[in-house]
Amino acid sequence: MLTPEQLAHCADDIINLYSQLEEEIVRDIARRIAKTGTMTDTGIWQAQHMQELGTLHSDVLSSVAKYSDRTESELKKLFEDAGVTATEYDNEIYRQNGLNPKSLKVSDVQMQLLEAGYKKTQGNLSNLTLTTAVSSQTSFINACSLAELKASSGAFTPQQAIADAIKQVAQDGAYVIYPSGHRDRLDVAVRRNVTTGIGQTTGQICLSNAQELGCDLMEITAHAGARPSHAAWQGQIVSLSGQRGYLSLSDIGYGTGDGFKGWNCRHDWYPYFEGSSRMYSDKGLEELNAKNIEYPDGSMHTLYEAEQQQRAFERKIRATKRTLAACDEALNNLSDEQLLQKLEKNFSHYSSKLKRQESELNSFCKRTGLLPDRSRQQAYGFGRSPAQKAVWKNNK
């Protein structure tokens, strides 16, 4: 078994790496937009941005390959550590009940499940991140086309149009494209893929172990802030064979995307033997779902609702940091004085906005008792240089 906290943060190190990739892509696009000039000659400007478009795809693919190589070993170790942790917890329960379970490393079946889960997750990551090369081209084309349209309309100066284009690509960030056509931000897709992959793989290993040892009952973990559909069965006992008096696998949606072990699910299970003490009482489970979190406006909410609000604050902070990083990159690659002044003004504006957003999040966390999650606020291209500049601008 893995705890909800372990599953919640298992993808953090992988996301850190892919966040660096996202910022590298955003900076690359911002730099290319800045290098194309200010549209004094539309024909020349179009030729320049088409030339940049031609090299953008290959450069993004090179960046993806670089980060994929770095994440492969990290992901392998993550799966191995998760598998060992999950089976050691379960095996202690089996031993306490007179059984002799196999450790992960000596069980061919468990190792095969671990390897299959790792390869599936790694394959999904590779396929998804490769689509960022195409999506980056789309972002670049859309931003340049909109800039040209704005400038040609006469309602915007060329400098304003290009500054807006740089802001647009930063706000969009890097995104992946699924076969269905659905789009997701890169960090969102990575977190979902890794968390789901780890959860499903350790769940399958625990299930295989239970079946081999003849254990029919499993207790499901519980945590505050569970989505409402999962709160209905968390902390309960499930029968693998469908015994009466217990939840069945279909009751918990096992094998479905929005059920137990589905997308982003932080629940796990572990062996339970009739007559053993339960980890969660009915009262304790009720308290996990209570509306006992007070917002600054005095309204009461569940922890799930409060955490969703916290995630919204964090997304806004990351977007602002990406915009500052993109402005910083463009400022380092410009010679047009008017555009420089415009981007300097934008940098000052977003520096103040960042300070305000961080203050709002800190106040919200302090009032609700939630802990700030710095890993969800960080935009990894927003390094020391733009951070120091933002602070300096804010203190002027």
Residue ranges and their predicted role:
Residues 1-164, 284-396:
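N-terminal leader/targeting and assembly helices and adjacent pre-domain segments
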Residues 16, 116, 173-176, 244, ...:
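Intrinsically disordered, low-complexity segments enriched in small/polar residues
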Residues 34, 40, 170, 178, ...:
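Generic detector of intrinsically disordered, low-complexity, polar/charged segments
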Residues 65-69, 178-184, 267-270:
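Short, exposed beta-strand "edge-strand" segments with a Pro/Gly-rich flavor and a Y/T-containing core
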Residues 123-213:
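Contiguous, non-catalytic segments that form substrate-binding/exosite surfaces or channel walls
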Residues 184-287:
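Acidic, glycine-rich two-metal-ion catalytic cores of nucleic acid-processing enzymes
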